């Protein structure tokens, strides 16, 4: 039985330094039928880059996008306390910098705040160590590259291993878990991973397509 596929457009690849161009790119995505946005937040410490604060969340909400915020920060609870008054639908964070207890408390806090909650894992993280936490997640993001920058090459071997592991965990303890792949996504990667993945996150590759609708249609056809 094939899985229903979704596509999230990663704002990390958008031209955020040029407001007009950024808005044009958003319009292009919206007109192509893509309703989901992946909104990376980076502190420059958890990953070697800095990205988005809250500046675009209200506009994305007004435009009708479903927004998944992804914290790549060392203090996710502090960031959530700031972000929680802004409109978005889902939130994931990297659990590696904090204790498992604090990660569990944050997952519960996110859900209590009315959002879907998830964890995002770096390629070399041992997923089995986070099995008990995954039970409390609505979704999990598997990174196909080292997080921080867009346009990287897909890490095939380790990512396939992680996708198999997270699917095994899903079957065992959380059958409704949504599995998301973020990083290195292209047509070949989608074909290779389609039986493991529900949602693909694409930025650089998506914006390179002359017709973004073709990528969306391709994902839904797999």
Regions found by a protein language model. Name each.
Residues 143-145, 157, 161, 166-171:
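Classical nucleotidyltransferase
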Residues 1-90, 98-101, 109, 117, ...:
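Conserved N-terminal beta1-alpha1 strand-loop-helix module at the mouth
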Residues 65, 88, 113-115, 170, ...:
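A short helix->loop->beta-strand "cap" motif at the edges of active sites that frequently abuts
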Residues 168, 172-181, 186-190, 194, ...:
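Alpha/beta catalytic cores of nucleotide-metabolism and tRNA/nucleoside-modifying enzymes
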Residues 91-99, 143-153, 196-216:
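Glycine-rich phosphate-binding active-site loops on the catalytic face of alpha/beta enzymes
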Residues 117-121, 179-182:
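Short, hydrophobic beta-strand segments that form beta-sheet elements in well-ordered domains
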Residues 37-39, 143, 181-183:
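Active-site flanking residues adjacent to catalytic metal/cofactor-binding acidic residues
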């Amino acid at each position: 039985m094939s899985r229903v596929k979704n596509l999230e457009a990663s704002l990390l690849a958008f031209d955020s330094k040029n407001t007009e161009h950024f808005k044009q790119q958003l319009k292009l995505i919206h007109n192509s039928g893509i309703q989901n946005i992946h909104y990376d937040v980076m502190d420059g410490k958890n990953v070697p880059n800095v990205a988005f604060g809250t500046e675009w969340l209200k506009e994305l909400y007004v435009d009708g996008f479903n927004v998944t915020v992804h914290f790549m920060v060392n203090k996710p609870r502090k960031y959530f306390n700031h972000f929680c008054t802004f409109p978005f639908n889902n939130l994931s964070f990297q659990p590696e910098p904090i204790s498992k207890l604090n990660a569990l408390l944050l997952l519960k806090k996110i859900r209590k705040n009315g959002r879907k909650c998830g964890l995002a894992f770096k390629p070399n993280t041992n997923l089995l160590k986070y099995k008990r936490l995954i039970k409390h997640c609505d979704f999990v993001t598997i990174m196909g590259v080292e997080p921080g920058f867009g346009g990287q090459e897909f890490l095939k071997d380790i990512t396939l291993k992680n996708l198999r592991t997270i699917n095994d965990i899903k079957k065992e303890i959380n059958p409704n878990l949504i599995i998301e792949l973020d990083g290195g996504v292209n047509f070949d990667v989608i074909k290779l991973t389609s039986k493991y993945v529900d949602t693909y996150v694409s930025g650089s590759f998506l914006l390179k397509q002359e017709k973004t609708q073709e990528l969306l249609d391709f994902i839904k056809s797999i």
